[in-house]
């Protein structure tokens, strides 16, 4: 029997509180099989666990597992992992490259924050029939949506269904039918729903969001960097490319609340959106020792 060390790191913390906890495995990750990684993620039982591996083409390679299945990308686990790597002196410089299933992605360290490069999201409006299904699965109607944000499918490596809601209280009191959300998400090959309002809990922020991902074993989580990136791309299109940063809240409307702050910074080339940098702060919550007996 051997024991695997898993750091529990809160990523996208808002000030010194909240965030979304991720499991991070560094030293013990390299010789674990995919079956072992999945079992460790199941036992850790947080939304995602990241395994930090060596890469032949980049500085590092991260693999991510929810409690029930692998997932291509994970924003908060990436932020948590690279903040910890920086704090432990393992990063050779402030910008490194992470190998992903979709190719190399840059990681930038700014003090105690880490930012991950995301490709500009492809945004596609849902058809009327699917839109009705999505709204029914949340217990809302068309007249409760933002006028210019009917549900749309977003793809930046992870696929999400983004739903703009006009009123913060409607977002707060959603009635998600997890079985229906799971079925719709699986049919559209999506990780999650990402419902948002442009009215924030804390003043001066651009949006508040909630994430539902039962297709990946996640009922609701408090910070979702890979879904926040497409929301920032949509906000950027509405701002005509004039903004340097977007501040997105998540976790405030959960019970219990776990306030999270996600920062998104557009990168432009030739006047066009070339990348969206999504990041924030992270702090260690604790350490778990997971025994494996095979």
Q: What is each residue range found by the language model?
A:
Residues 1-73, 79-294:
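Active-site proximal loop and beta-alpha junction motif in alpha/beta enzyme cores
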């Amino acid at each position: 029997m051997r024991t695997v060390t898993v750091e529990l790191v809160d990523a996208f913390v808002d000030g010194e509180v909240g965030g979304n906890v991720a499991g991070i495995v560094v030293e013990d990750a390299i010789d674990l099989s995919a079956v072992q990684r999945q079992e460790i993620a199941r036992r850790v039982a947080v939304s995602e666990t990241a395994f930090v591996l060596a890469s032949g083409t980049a500085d590092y390679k991260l693999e991510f597992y929810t409690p029930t299945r692998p997932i291509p990308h994970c924003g908060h686990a990436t932020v948590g992992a690279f903040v910890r790597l920086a704090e432990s002196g393992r990063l050779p410089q402030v910008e490194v490259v992470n190998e992903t299933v979709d190719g190399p992605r840059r990681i930038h360290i700014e003090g105690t924050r880490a930012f991950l490069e995301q490709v500009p999201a492809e945004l596609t409006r849902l058809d009327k029939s699917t839109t009705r299904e999505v709204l029914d699965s949340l217990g809302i109607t068309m007249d409760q949506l933002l006028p210019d944000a009917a549900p749309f499918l977003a793809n930046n490596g992870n696929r999400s269904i983004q739903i703009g809601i006009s009123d913060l209280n409607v977002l707060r009191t959603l009635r998600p039918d997890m079985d229906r959300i799971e079925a719709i998400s699986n049919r559209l090959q999506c990780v999650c729903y990402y419902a948002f309002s442009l009215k924030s809990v804390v003043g001066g922020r651009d949006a508040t969001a909630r994430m539902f991902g039962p297709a990946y074993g996640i009922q609701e989580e408090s910070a979702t960097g890979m879904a926040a990136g497409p929301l920032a791309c949509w906000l950027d299109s509405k701002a005509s490319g004039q903004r340097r940063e977007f501040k997105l809240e998540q976790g405030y409307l959960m019970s219990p609340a776990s306030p999270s702050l996600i920062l998104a910074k557009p990168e432009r080339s030739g006047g066009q959106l070339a990348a969206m940098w999504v990041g924030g702060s992270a702090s260690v919550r604790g350490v778990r020792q997971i025994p494996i007996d095979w």
